[in-house]
């Protein structure tokens, strides 16, 4: 039972325990499968009336499970925009904080990798996918556990890069680390497939409901209203 109104340009965070329905909500938005009851609309048009290909062209996704293809680093990033120049690819990689590790690879941007990413770490593979999204410049972002396998220092840098990327774009962030979504315009708190709370970080803490206890479990020694 969901009822949410997301305005253009809003940053929306989706949080809750494992299995609460966060990923299902994203799958419905992307039309990986369709809603059985009710409807999801974009600018007043039900998503079922928008072709899947046309719908997904507007979305940029960074998932916990990365997807790469056999080919060079350059080709993998350029999937976000096949017509992009070398300089544009490098610029996107710099924004994603991937440029420095790419430069250290044997052949830099021309280093070949397999679908499993070869010797790249999970964090490095995610950085490549983030660079790809930087390059395709979508109108809507979906970040599903995007920084879950990246070290804390890199995560901070990526968060800053995404703050720039999210400006003027509607963004949906699915995360377990509540510290990364405190600045969201709207936080949807899910449990058992239902949105049980919604509001800003400050308002949800002041309500002292489920979100308050979820946040407190991660930061027990933090001033909750800070």
Task: Enumerate the language-model features and the residues they cover.
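ABC-type nucleotide-binding domain
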Residues: 1-226
């Amino acid at each position: 039972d969901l009822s949410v109104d997301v305005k253009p340009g809003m940053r929306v965070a989706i949080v809750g325990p494992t299995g609460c329905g966060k990923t299902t909500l994203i799958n419905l938005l992307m039309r990986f499968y369709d809603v059985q009851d009710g409807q999801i609309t974009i600018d007043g048009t039900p998503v079922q009336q928008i072709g899947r290909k046309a719908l997904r062209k507007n979305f940029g996704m960074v998932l916990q499970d990365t997807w790469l293809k056999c080919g060079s680093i350059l080709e993998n990033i350029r999937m976000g925009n096949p017509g992009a120049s070398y300089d544009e690819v490098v610029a996107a990689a710099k924004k994603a904080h991937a440029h420095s590790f790419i430069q250290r690879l044997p052949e830099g941007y021309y280093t070949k990798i397999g679908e499993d990413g070869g010797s790249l770490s999970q964090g490095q593979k995610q950085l490549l996918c983030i660079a790809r999204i930087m390059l395709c410049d979508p109108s809507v972002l979906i970040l599903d556990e995007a920084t879950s396998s990246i070290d804390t220092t890199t995560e901070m840098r990526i968060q800053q890069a995404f703050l720039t990327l999210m400006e003027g774009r509607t963004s949906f962030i699915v995360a377990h680390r509540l510290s990364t979504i405190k600045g969201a315009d709207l936080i949807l708190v899910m449990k058992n497939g239902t949105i049980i709370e919604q509001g800003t970080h400050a308002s949800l803490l002041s309500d002292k409901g489920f979100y308050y206890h979820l946040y407190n479990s991660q930061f027990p020694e933090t001033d909750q209203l800070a």
